[in-house]
Curated annotation (Swiss-Prot):
Regions of compositional bias (Polar residues) in chain numbering: 85-114, 890-899
Protein name as annotated: Autophagy-related protein 9B
Origin: domain of life: Eukaryota
InterPro entries, A to Z: Autophagy-rel_prot_9
Gene: Atg9b
Organism name: Mus musculus (Mouse)
Tissue: Expressed in heart, brain, and placenta and testis.
């Protein structure tokens, strides 16, 4: 694991934003009291620590103490890297330095716990002539890239230093805080929480909407509890159902009618019935305690969001009334510009779009990587050989508590993974401890399951019964599952970007499911007959009620009409739609794939058509199935914790050990989130020759390559690192090469004439949909399985890339606002074509590999788990030294793995529990 030292400081300090995250540097000046003798420039001006010049660097693992120049109040401590050319975060003066040579004080290097570790911070002793005061608790600095020199500036103000020139002052720009930008954001101690709340404030539409949303949620909880108690203890159902005479009589012609007031018990009698039930009183006390906890948390969050509103208004110059018209990209751009101008002093410097995404999506990127490696979601084998994925809201909350935010989790809600998880000799001890934590959490879930189940039933009853009465067909509609939002998500993709992409993919994906559904003529025949008979009975009762409304007073007539309507609606959903018959399911799948970008493999599915259908069906599931999963979640969550996650404790510990890196200025993040093609690329996704990843280190389904492409298109100002930039250049070159091979525009027109050539398409998304669903037949012999060949896609991709680079080509004659609105749509269309292009190249490469394998060994089955077809299919190892036999669950998955998930019902697999304890836990 690559160990990168971040900006140091105390890691357990707390402030407004919680735990002290890495690289939190308070702005100077600030409202908090500063240590004595601060650094000052000429005229008593306070200067930023970033305006000071760096000291010379050394390659030895020692610390260098630089005596300051006359009047220089700063002490510099330096650490040298061992393997990379050092870079410095501070600006270098253009003229030679006049500082005295440093005095080297050698220290012994600390022991290394792995080949990728770096020594801890070197110690230094200040000169006797310049005593070093204690650092301010908020001042935290460090390197920007791994294994490089860094400098820490200490306050040391000798007498008369305020009027002395600072070294490099004549050559370096002074970064200072403008007088009008002084607020609570100048002393940020948890940048993860700060950036996350900035994003959440924008997505939740400002402080007023956040306040009302929290108030309504608290009020909804009170309503559900009080109304349910009222229905249980304060209503006389014998009077309401007219089974006994009412409590009092009323004069007049309507004296025999039962009113609601007749069935409601008096308040004293209602309170007495509540007191007579100790269980109900206990549940009400629990509900009151939970409500008070939610109220306290909401109040604390509202104070934080009020500060965020002030930050938006004063620092970003976005008033609340204009927030809805400002996209997130503009907010992020202003945030980065504010940091570059010195108004927000955080590290790394300069702040990039990727740094912001790393902090907002620190835990989410881990979850996406866990899903990519097969550890999420939980799966259960089905009797017919396939498997069912399960990831309810309750299970996702428990996973979050186990791994990230719980008191006994790996991260414990912070930005740093403890050092013990980065040591390979403690993996067995940590796995056993995590198993005990899972067992404890499963026991708590099992104990609370009756209460949670009752709450789920009540909430579903109050939320969906009206919809069932008014529109029963809504439960037959499909919606993206929680599994889809996890498996189809790119690394570093924000929630609103994912929602927009899946929203564009919904219609073609739903059409594909209707077109590719396996034929079931008998089921359709029975459904038609059921619709006819239930509809006939419903029509007869409806006519009778129209003729005489007293028919509704007959017992169970209204209930019968409701049941008949629901039955007809449900049965009609099993009848195939005529408009979907005859449409090519392959074209619809390609149109959906253009926006989904992924179609993860379904374990145990056989046949290409059946596999694609069941994959999509689990991603885009019925609303009724989703509701049923949430209702059963309190009962199934403890079982999956015990029999899915607990046996995989060692694999999960190994995952965090091998796929965690410490990025300077950011903290510990998932290594997949760096989108490093060299480390996590896949040779079958155009990374051949550019990646050094072993089989267990590769991201499946081209996740690294597609995530890198999406992020680079969405953030054109972002500069990718060397290997990633090389991959993007190679991809652009391959696109140009295939586009040239397809033919020049003068001799071969695009599949949709006039859309790309004259730039008259008002909506790029409409163009893309027309292209994918109605492609022009290719003019050369191509595989019938590729309706839009790679060369044709490359030609279109090259054309639309020119449109993105030339905004004047978008909607000629339109206003500037219209052009800016259409540019993101063009970028989305370009990314869709990139996804199709990469999938086509991947398919071609797989076909070539299959052809070579069948030619060399025609008698050997390619996908046999016991006989791998290529060296790459050998069983991978998660450990670089070969000490761990655990392999990637995604690679292990097969028929044998599926059969051993829950042998004999729900029995625990103890294979991973036999790992010996190799070292004590410190």
């Amino acid at each position: 694991m690559v160990r990168r030292t971040g900006w140091g400081g105390s890691r357990r300090q707390r402030g407004r934003w919680g735990d002290l995250g890495p690289s939190s540097v308070p702005l100077l000046p600030m409202a908090l009291p500063l240590p004595a003798s601060p650094c000052r420039g000429t005229g008593g001006r306070r200067i930023s620590v970033f305006s000071l010049s760096p000291a010379p660097r050394t390659r030895s693992c020692s610390s260098s103490v630089f005596p300051p120049a006359s009047g220089s109040p700063c002490l510099v401590i330096q650490e040298a890297g061992a393997s990379q050319t050092p870079h410095n975060v501070l600006p270098t003066p253009t003229t030679p330095s006049t500082q005295a040579h440093p005095t080297m004080i050698h220290t012994s290097a600390s022991p290394s716990w792995g080949s990728h570790s770096t020594p801890p911070l070197a110690s230094a002793t200040p000169p006797p002539s310049c005593p070093r005061p204690q650092d301010h608790p908020g001042l935290r600095m460090g390197p920007l890239i791994p294994e490089q020199d860094y400098e820490r500036l200490e306050d040391c103000d000798p007498e008369g230093s305020q009027d002395s020139p600072i070294h490099g002052e004549d050559h370096q720009p002074l970064l200072h805080v403008p007088e009008g930008l002084r607020g609570s954001w100048h002393h940020i101690q948890n940048l993860d929480s700060f950036f996350t709340k900035i994003y959440s404030y924008h997505q939740r539409n400002g402080f007023a909407c956040i306040l009302l949303e929290d108030v309504f949620q608290l009020g909804q909880f009170i309503f559900i509890v009080t109304f349910t108690t009222f229905l249980l203890r304060c209503v006389d159902y014998n009077v309401l159902f007219n089974n006994q005479p009412k409590n009092h009589t009323r004069r007049g012609p309507l004296h025999s009618k039962v009113t609601l007031s007749d069935a409601i018990l008096p308040s004293a009698q209602c309170a007495e019935k509540i007191h007579d039930s100790p269980l109900l009183v206990f549940l009400l006390v629990l509900a009151a305690g939970f409500w008070l906890f939610q109220l306290l948390r909401s109040v604390c969050n509202l104070f934080s969001y009020w500060d965020i509103q002030v930050f938006y208004r004063e620092a970003l110059h976005i008033p609340p009334e204009e927030l809805s018209s400002v996209p997130w990209a503009e907010v992020q751009s202003r945030l980065l510009e504010l940091q570059r101008s010195g108004g927000l002093c955080v590290q790394p410097r300069p702040l990039t779009e990727l740094d912001v995404h790393h902090r907002i999506l620190r835990y989410t990127n881990y979850q996406v990587a866990l899903a990519n490696k097969g550890l999420l979601p939980a799966r259960c084998p089905l009797p017919w050989g396939s498997s069912a994925a399960f990831l309810s809201r309750g299970l996702a909350l428990n996973v979050d508590l186990l791994l990230f935010r719980g008191p006994f989790s790996l991260f414990r809600g912070g930005w740093e993974l403890p050092e013990a998880y980065k040591r390979s000799d403690l993996r067995g001890v940590l796995a056993n401890r995590w198993r005990r934590t899972v067992l404890l959490l499963a026991a708590v879930n099992l104990a609370l399951s009756p209460l949670v189940l009752a709450w789920q039933v009540l909430h579903a009853f109050y939320s969906h019964v009206e919809l069932l009465r008014r529109e029963p067909g809504a439960f037959g509609a499909r919606r993206w599952s929680r599994l889809a939002r996890l498996q189809l998500r790119h690394f570093n993709e924000l929630p609103h970007e994912l929602r927009a992409r899946l929203g564009r993919a919904y219609r073609p994906a739903a059409a594909f499911l209707r077109a590719a559904e396996p034929p079931a003529p008998l089921r359709a025949l029975l459904a038609r007959q059921l619709v006819f008979f239930s509809g006939a009975l419903f029509a007869a009762l409806l006519v009778l009620t129209i003729y005489d409304e007293d028919v509704l007073a007959v017992e169970h007539v209204l209930t019968t009409m409701t049941a008949l309507g629901v039955t007809a609606t449900v049965a009609r959903s099993f009848i195939p739609e005529e408009q979907c018959q005859g449409r090519s399911s392959q074209l619809l799948l390609q149109a959906a794939l253009a926006h989904m970008h992924y179609l993860p493999e379904e374990p145990g599915a056989t046949g290409a058509r059946a596999s694609s259908y069941w994959q999509m069906a689990q991603l885009l599931q019925y609303r009724a199935v989703s509701l049923l999963e949430e209702l059963l979640s309190p009962l199934l969550t403890p079982l999956f914790l015990l029999f899915w996650f607990r046996p995989r404790a060692l694999e999960i510990i190994d995952f965090f050990h091998h796929f965690t890196v410490d990025v300077a200025g950011v903290g510990d993040i998932c290594s997949f989130a760096l989108m490093d093609v060299k480390r996590h690329g896949h040779p079958q996704w155009l990374s051949e020759g550019q990646t050094e990843a072993s089989l267990s280190q590769r991201a499946e389904d081209g996740k690294t390559e597609l995530s890198l492409m999406r992020f680079s298109l969405a953030h054109p100002q972002w500069q990718p690192p060397g290997h990633s930039s090389k991959f993007l250049g190679h991809l652009r070159g391959r696109v140009q090469q295939d586009a040239a091979a397809w033919g020049a525009p003068s001799t071969r027109s695009p599949p949709t004439p006039g859309v790309l050539s004259d730039c008259t398409s008002p909506l790029p998304e409409a163009f893309l949909a027309n292209l994918l669903v109605n492609p022009r037949p290719p003019q050369r012999d191509l595989s019938p399985t590729a309706p839009c060949p790679a060369a044709a896609t490359a030609s279109l991709l090259a054309s639309i890339s020119r449109m993105v680079q030339d905004p004047s080509c978008v909607s000629p004659g339109g206003t500037g606002g219209q052009k800016l609105t259409q540019l993101p749509e063009l970028v989305s269309a370009e990314m869709s074509l990139h996804a199709i292009y990469l999938h086509q190249l991947h398919q071609q490469q797989q076909q070539e590999l299959w052809g070579e394998a069948s030619a060399s060994s025609p008698s050997r089955p390619w996908s046999s788990p016991s006989q791998p077809g290529s060296p790459d299919e050998e069983k991978p190892s998660w450990s670089s030294d070969g000490s761990s036999p655990a392999s990637s669950p995604r690679q292990q998955w097969g028929t044998q793995r599926a059969q051993n998930l829950f042998p004999k019902g729900f029995q625990e697999n103890t294979d991973t529990q036999k790992e010996p304890l190799t070292g004590p836990l410190h």
